[in-house]
Amino acid sequence: MKQHRIIASLPQKATGETIFAYDTETQGLDATQVLIVCCENVSTGEQSTFLDASEFRAYLEGNAPCVAYAHNGSAFDVFGIISKDELYAAPKIASGTKVFEYEVNGVKYRDTKHLLPLRLSQVARSVSMEKGETPQEYIDGTVTEITQEAIDYCLL
């Protein structure tokens, strides 16, 4: 019979970093063509909307040190916030080609897909919510006006 040994360990102390959840809506499927960024302070529930990715980045950096989570963020959202060159040079936590975290100017950009390896619609259903439908013009890349409906979708 095999024996296993379990060693107890205490949880790490909280870092005190503010945690944000964010999402981007883009013109088509081009991550660099950000039209809307919505974020929520996980601790306070305060929501913010930005129509300029550089303003969002400045907001996060103004709250540094902090952690910003996006679902599929390492493969999409972060590329609309930080340039490829900056990401390449940034300290990162990775395993092979999977990047778990980029750190830029005191902001740790993390991907929730590594914590919840599901499609966003599956995550929503698991907590009895609906993901909602991406407005078609955002998929097609034909957005001509930012509507409240699109902002509400981004904040879901």
Where does each model-flagged region fall?
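Flexible, low-complexity linker/tail segments at the boundary of structured domains
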Residues: A150-C154
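Conserved DEDDh/DEDDy metal-dependent 3′-5′ exonuclease domain
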Residues: I19, C38-I146, L156
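Extended non-globular scaffold/tether segments
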Residues: T32-V37
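Intrinsically disordered, low-complexity regulatory regions enriched in Ser/Pro/Gly/Thr
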Residues: K13-A14, A31, G62
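N-terminal accessory regions of nucleic-acid-interacting proteins
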Residues: M1-F20, T24
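Short acidic, Gly/Ser-rich segments with clustered Asp/Glu that frequently serve as metal-coordination loops
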Residues: T24-A31
